[in-house]
Amino acid sequence: MEIKGKRILVTGASRGLGRALVTALVDAGADQVIAGTRKPEDREPLKSEHVTPVQLDVTSDADVEAVARMGAIDILINNAGVAGFGNPLTMSFEALKEEIDVNYLGVVRVTRAVAPGMISKDDGMIVNVATAFAKVNLPIVGTYCATKAALLSLGQALRAYLSKHNVRVITVMPTTIDTDMSRGFDVPKMTKEFVASEILTAIREERHDPPIGDEANGLCEQLAKDPLAVEKTLMNYKA
């Protein structure tokens, strides 16, 4: 799908990959990027001719409904996410619930609000930002991976209902990105700018649930050959 001239909503746009996506979309010629942030102090630095920062906590029905009233969106990028590090047997239920509410239910909430506008004009794209570890769990962030596995499955369901309306749904799957979320996580990391650029390519080429980066591609190739071996290797990465 062409990006130039489009009206695009990015959730979780205040920093990290979200901020990089906003910059990349403007550079690619987007007409308006609606940049969703939770904190008021994060909005002012985002303001520009083609960027409209808005209050958007994806766990808030009121925030989501307010953004939906701003009018139809051409491309929705569900980027907002939180990650809890730890053992699912001992992590607090509050942390688990936050991951589910932001990473999964937040996507459902925003997509439900935005999809009717796409359906009405018989055109649009929904991009869900997951991880290649949605396909095989990385235990140190095991519950985060579980929410992203749910997101990958959700994308398949959304395609079933939206394809007849010419609304494309893709789930992009990077591995670890060098952002605040991965600070202290001693593994190879991709830059947020690289991942943003790859996501824009996936949008333009309408790729089907693409892995992002060499590590993600390699992981998916290994999974196709010997999924049990991959799982056993990743079992060593625990909190």
Residue map of PLM features:
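Conserved glycine-rich cofactor-binding loop
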Residues: 14-15
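Conserved NAD(P)H cofactor-binding loop of Rossmann-fold oxidoreductase domains
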Residues: 80-85
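Substrate-binding pocket helix/loop in short-chain dehydrogenase/reductase
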Residues: 87-97
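Active-site loop immediately N-terminal to the catalytic Tyr-X3-Lys motif
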Residues: 89, 138-142
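A short, exposed helix-loop element centered on a Lys and neighboring polar residues
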Residues: 111-112, 156
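Residue(s) in the substrate-gating loop at a strand-loop-helix junction
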Residues: 131
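C-terminal helical subdomain
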Residues: 171, 179, 183-221
